């Protein structure tokens, strides 16, 4: 019986250290070293209301906004993941055709592949700078802004995630759309 009680104490101590202690330590390190990321990288509107996260894509469909990559999970953060469909699936091909048609792509003006294909998690908040520039004319026209100004805003918000290791610069779609809203209200 004595060894049984010792075993229970050991299990309790191990759980306390490994579950509660480790979790608390990781949480504390996150709060100190990366408080924004630890809190979900939330983005708030001017009135302080949280409107999204810089780490999760949102579905923008109005022509006045830049559109993110397609999502196999309908931009639902709780169900992140791919569609698990084969690249030869007719569903995938049909969705790609619909997306290409939605953008009005032609043989002379082909759609960047990333804008027709969902990311692995279905929640990628970024598109390439090239993908954003592809949409600039539509967004500028819908907002009544000069295309050069919209393109300048894209370049301003583009960043290289891996410095010299990443071939393409990326743009966060939500942050770019919010910047456009600020430009529109200021102008």
Swiss-Prot record:
Pfam family, one: KdpC
Subcellular location: Cell inner membrane
Predominant subcellular localization, coarse grouping: membrane
GO cellular component: a single term: plasma membrane
Domain of life of the organism encoding this protein: Bacteria
Cystine bridges: none
Transmembrane segments: 10-30
Keyword annotations from UniProtKB, A to Z: ATP-binding, Cell inner membrane, Cell membrane, Ion transport, Membrane, Nucleotide-binding, Potassium, Potassium transport, Transmembrane, Transmembrane helix, Transport
Entry keyword Cytoplasm: no
Protein's UniProt keywords contain Ion transport: yes
Subunit annotation: The system is composed of three essential subunits: KdpA, KdpB and KdpC.
Primary role: Part of the high-affinity ATP-driven potassium transport (or Kdp) system, which catalyzes the hydrolysis of ATP coupled with the electrogenic transport of potassium into the cytoplasm. This subunit acts as a catalytic chaperone that increases the ATP-binding affinity of the ATP-hydrolyzing subunit KdpB by the formation of a transient KdpB/KdpC/ATP ternary complex.
Family: Belongs to the KdpC family.
HAMAP family per UniProt: KdpC (MF_00276)
Name of the protein: Potassium-transporting ATPase KdpC subunit
Gene coding for it: kdpC
């Amino acid at each position: 019986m004595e060894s049984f009680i010792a075993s229970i104490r050991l299990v309790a101590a191990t759980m306390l250290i490994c579950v509660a202690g480790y979790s608390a330590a990781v949480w504390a390190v996150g709060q100190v070293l990366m408080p924004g990321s630890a809190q979900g990288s939330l983005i708030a509107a001017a009135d302080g209301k949280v409107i999204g996260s810089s780490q999760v894509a949102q579905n923008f469909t109005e022509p006045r906004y830049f559109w993110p990559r397609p999502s196999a999970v309908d931009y639902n953060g709780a169900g992140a993941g791919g569609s698990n469909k084969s690249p030869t699936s007719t569903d995938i091909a049909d969705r790609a055709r619909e997306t290409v048609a939605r953008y009005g792509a032609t043989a002379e003006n082909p759609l960047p592949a990333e804008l027709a294909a969902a990311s692995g998690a279905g929640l990628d908040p970024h598109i390439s700078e090239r993908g954003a520039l592809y949409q600039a004319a539509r967004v500028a026209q819908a907002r009544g802004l000069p295309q050069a100004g919209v393109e300048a805003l894209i370049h301003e918000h583009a960043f290289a995630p891996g410095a010299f290791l990443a071939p393409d610069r990326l743009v966060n779609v939500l942050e770019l759309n919010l910047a456009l809203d600020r430009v529109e209200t200021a102008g």
